[in-house]
Structure formats: C-alpha cells, structure tokens
C-alpha cells in the first residue's frame, strides 16, 4: 500500500524559489578587500535569485548550454558565485567549481575529465586560467565576472565574455524545468588525495537533504536572522552546503572573497556581526593570535565550525 502524502522532487529549484519569495530581503555581503573598488558589496536573496535566472537564460541562449553540460567556476566566495551555482544547477546543467589552489595540471585534468564547456572566472585569475586552458579542449567559453574583460589572451577557439554584459537585458524570470531529484546538480573534485583528483556527483535530492540537516541544532544550526560567515570555499564541498540551508531559513551570509587573512577577517567580523562561521583550522588559529595582539571591542561570533584537518590544541 502506498501513502497518500504529497510526493514532490527535492530540488535546488524549490530552495531557490522559496528563499527568494519568503526570505528575499535577507542580506548577502561580499567583502572585496583584495579587489579594487568598494570593500563591502551588499545584495539579497531575491536579487541573487533573479540574476541566477538571467544567467540561466545566458547559458541557454548565448553559451549553448541546453542539457546537463558541466559549467565550471574559477573564483572565490562571492555573490556571483551563488548566482552561477543556482542558475546552472536549477537549469539542469551541472555546477563544477574548480579549486585554484591545485596545481595547473590537476585543474586541467578536472576540466578534461568533467568535459567542462563553460567557465565563469574572476578576472584576477585570468593569467592562471589561460595557462590551465592550454590543452583543455572541451572549454569553448570563459565568462569573467565584472563589467569588463581582462587583457589576457585565452587559447584559440575560446570565446570570452563579460558577466555583467552577458546578463544585461536578460529576463530575470526563468521557467525552471521539473527535474528528477536524482539528477546531478554539482560535480566536485577531491583535493589532497593520492593520484589525480576524483569527482563526486551530488544530486539535487542530496543537496536538499543536506540543507535541511544543516538547520538542525545537532549540526551547524543555520538559523533565521543569524549571520553566517562562510570561510569554506564553494569549491570545497559547496561551502559545506551552507548556502542551501541559508536559503531555506533566511540566514544572512557573509562571503570573504579572496582575502581571509587575520586582519581582514577581524575587520569583516567587526563590520558584519556574524554569529556563526566555518573554515579550516589554520584560519581560526591565525585569527586567535591576531585577537591576542588586537583584542576586539566587541565579539558577536559565538560558534566556529572547523574541518578539513584536525584542530590542534591552542
């Protein structure tokens, strides 16, 4: 006998739509201390969701992504990274973040193994990406975040676009397909393992359930109204799935971009008042030493989750 309860696919599309409708004004702050221009860039869930839809249109209409092609990213934690994540996965393509800290030949291996066709990259990484793409034959387009394209040549046959120009004028409404919840949403590759990096395909269902689990008090307790500082990069297990839990609950996010040095993090924490954060132990040990020399006037951070390596005794 089957139940009479509702049965709907657990997909990132439902998370995206719910977060933008119910928690649309929840803030996302990107801290651009290592980039020219304003340090603090503010947006919200509704705007990110709308721009994710515009990016999905660009993928289909201009970049030729019509199925489950892999779309890579080569960037740090920022609002645009979330737009690309949601826009890619909800469209039915496979989001594939690349770890810039790997050796170039390892990154090239990932691109070739995943057969990535489009890469969205930070222009500060243009020179490294140009070297990586030599011998990465599957890539046919690179999109650089920002309004302009960096003066760096990409290999022959690779079209180069500006992210803002690509999104300009696009509809911010997308008729997301109804995906089987077992459909792959993201493809992440291992680091620090023997041999070549190894890929793991995450289903929409798995990421949906992860987001629900992260809301639990027995887990990271991602909670409505409590700001979460995301120092785990999106290219490391999708920042542990925290963005999905945040979209479910309405938890504001702080994204530190490229600079997670102690002085910068101390400034970010003082300015944005996060209650919870996650990151590798090295970051927090360095921040602890910084605070010993420069005690903060006030401290809102009450919980830190560390992973990736054992936490040494302080």
Regions found by a protein language model. Give the residues of each.
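A short N-terminal helical cap/helix-turn-helix that marks the beginning
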Residues: 7-31, 50
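Structural core segment of the AMP-binding/adenylate-forming
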Residues: 14, 90-165, 273, 280
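Conserved AMP-binding/adenylate-forming core of the ANL superfamily
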Residues: 28-86, 103-108, 162-165
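Conserved AMP-binding A3 loop
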Residues: 41-47, 185-212
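Conserved AMP-binding/adenylation subdomain of ANL enzymes
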Residues: 208-227, 235-275, 290-292
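Conserved pre-ATP/AMP-binding loop-to-beta segment of ANL
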Residues: 24-27, 155-161, 168-189, 196, ...
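Adenylate-forming
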Residues: 76, 121-131, 147-149, 232, ...
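A short helix-loop-beta submotif of the ANL/AMP-binding
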Residues: 69-70, 76-96, 100-104, 112-118, ...
């Amino acid at each position: 006998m089957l139940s009479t309860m509702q049965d709907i696919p657990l997909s990132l599309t439902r998370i995206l739509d719910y977060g933008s409708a119910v928690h649309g004004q929840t803030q996302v702050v990107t801290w651009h201390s290592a980039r020219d221009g304003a340090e603090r860039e503010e947006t919200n869930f509704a705007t990110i969701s709308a721009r994710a839809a515009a990016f999905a249109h660009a993928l289909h209409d201009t970049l030729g992504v019509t199925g489950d092609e892999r779309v890579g990213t080569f960037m740090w934690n920022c609002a645009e990274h979330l737009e690309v994540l949601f826009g890619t996965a909800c469209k039915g393509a496979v989001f594939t973040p690349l770890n810039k800290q790997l050796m170039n030949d390892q990154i090239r291996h990932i691109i070739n193994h995943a057969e990535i066709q489009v890469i969205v990259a930070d222009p500060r990484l243009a020179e490294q990406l140009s070297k990586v793409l030599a011998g990465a034959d599957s890539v046919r387009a690179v999109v650089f975040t920002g309004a302009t394209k960096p003066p760096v040549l990409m290999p022959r046959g690779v079209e180069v676009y500006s992210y803002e120009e690509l999104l300009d004028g696009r509809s911010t409404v997308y008729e997301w397909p109804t995906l089987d919840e077992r459909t792959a949403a993201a493809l992440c590759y291992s680091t620090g393992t023997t041999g070549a990096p190894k890929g793991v395909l995450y289903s929409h269902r798995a990421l949906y359930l992860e987001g629900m689990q992260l809301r639990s008090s027995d887990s990271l307790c991602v909670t409505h109204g409590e700001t979460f500082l995301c120092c785990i990069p999106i290219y490391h297990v999708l920042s542990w799935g925290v963005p999905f839990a945040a979209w479910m609950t309405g938890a504001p996010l702080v994204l530190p971009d490229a600079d997670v040095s102690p002085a910068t993090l101390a400034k970010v924490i003082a300015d944005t008042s996060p209650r919870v954060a996650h990151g590798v132990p090295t970051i927090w040990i360095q921040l602890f030493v910084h605070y010993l020399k420069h005690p903060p006037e006030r401290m809102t951070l009450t919980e830190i989750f560390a992973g990736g390596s054992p936490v040494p005794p302080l």
